[in-house]
Every structure is written in C-alpha cells, then in structure tokens.
A protein has these predicted regions:
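First exposed extracellular module after export/assembly in secreted or surface-exposed proteins
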Residues: 30-184
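Bacterial signal peptide processing site
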Residues: 20-23
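Positively charged n-region of N-terminal signal peptides that target proteins for export
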Residues: 1-5, 10
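C-terminal motif of bacterial Sec signal peptides marking the signal peptidase cleavage site
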Residues: 15-18
C-alpha cells in the first residue's frame, strides 16, 4: 500500500513538472542595469577601471559571437563588428552629453577616438533557438588621463546574431577618479 502511494505521488510530481511551459522572451535582447563597481588594488589605490553589471534575456538565445565571426556583417570594418555598443557620456554643466574620448597616438602624432565597444563570446554552444537569461559583468576603463576628475556615465546596448538590438541602459554617475572625490 505504501509503495502505491509513493508511486502515485511520484507520478503526480512528474506530471506537474512536465506540464510547465518553457520560459518565453521576445527575440530582441533585453537588458537591465544591475550596478557599477570600482576596481581598487590591495593598497587601496584606484585601478582606473570598474565593472558594469547588467542582466539580459533573449527569446532565441542567439547572443554572442565566435572568434571566427569575421565575415559580413561581423567583419572588422562592418557596422556590426561589435555586439556590445557603449557610448561615453560626460557631465557638462550638469547634463550628461555623449562625448568622444580621445587618446594621443605617438605614431601618427594625432589623437585617435577611443572605443568602448566590445565583442562578447557566444552564450550557448548550439544554434537551436531557446530562450536564455543571465547576468553579464563587463570590465571597463573609466579613468581619463586628459581629464582626470570627470563625472561620466555609459550608455550600453547589445545585439544578437540576427542583429536584433536591445534596449539602451545607462549607468549611474561614475567618477573617473573616486579616490580624489573622497578627499574633497
């Protein structure tokens, strides 16, 4: 009798879990800002970098690129080479404005525009469409030697392999030199 009750309960639990609908998300990626963390060395000096954290969902799970994804539309000179697009925004008169960040190039004796854009690896090993969700941490430089005491933000969006673009998220205000800010 006890065995029949146990088997009946196991069957009931199995049926309950097998009837669950799979998670569904839109095919366009969606991201949500989770936070920013400054990276500080053991001696309490600022590294000049931080971690931007955000969560993501994608209905068909086609997020990320392989190293071999070098042909159009993912070629180096193509508009979709990067699957994480990041805009640098500087606080000017109390408002955050998209600003190109420049870096001196000693070879050309001119300034180059710095890009914060990135390529992140595929998040699934298969091309079979399946909804995914998770969290991503991205290490990013925040210190600007040409303007060492700025307040900035980043705007971030991602693209999937089908070139669907996510919503845009924005970080909170970030100090390019948080150690100096604490001393003021």
């Amino acid at each position: 009798m006890k065995n029949r009750i146990l088997i009946g309960m196991l069957l009931l639990v199995t049926v309950m879990f097998s009837c669950q609908k799979p998670v569904e998300y839109p095919v366009e990626p969606k991201i949500a800002y989770e936070g920013f963390t400054y990276l500080v060395y053991e001696d309490s000096t600022f590294s000049g970098e931080g971690i931007v954290s955000f969560s993501y969902t994608d209905g068909d799970g086609d997020l990320g690129l392989d190293d071999s994804d070098t042909l159009p539309p993912f070629g180096f000179h193509d508009a979709h080479y990067y699957n994480m697009v990041i805009d640098y925004m500087k606080c000017v008169n109390g408002e955050f404005v998209k600003t190109p960040l420049l870096s001196w190039n000693p070879q050309t004796q001119s300034y180059d525009t710095v890009t914060f854009n990135a390529r992140f690896r595929r998040l699934r090993d298969t091309d079979e469409p399946k909804a995914i969700s998770g969290k991503m941490d991205y290490q990013i430089t925040v210190q600007n030697p040409l303007s060492p005491d700025d307040t900035i933000k980043f705007e971030i969006r991602i693209l999937d392999r089908a070139l669907h673009e996510s919503n845009v998220i924005q970080t909170e205000a970030i100090y390019t030199n948080p150690i100096l800010r604490k001393q003021i």
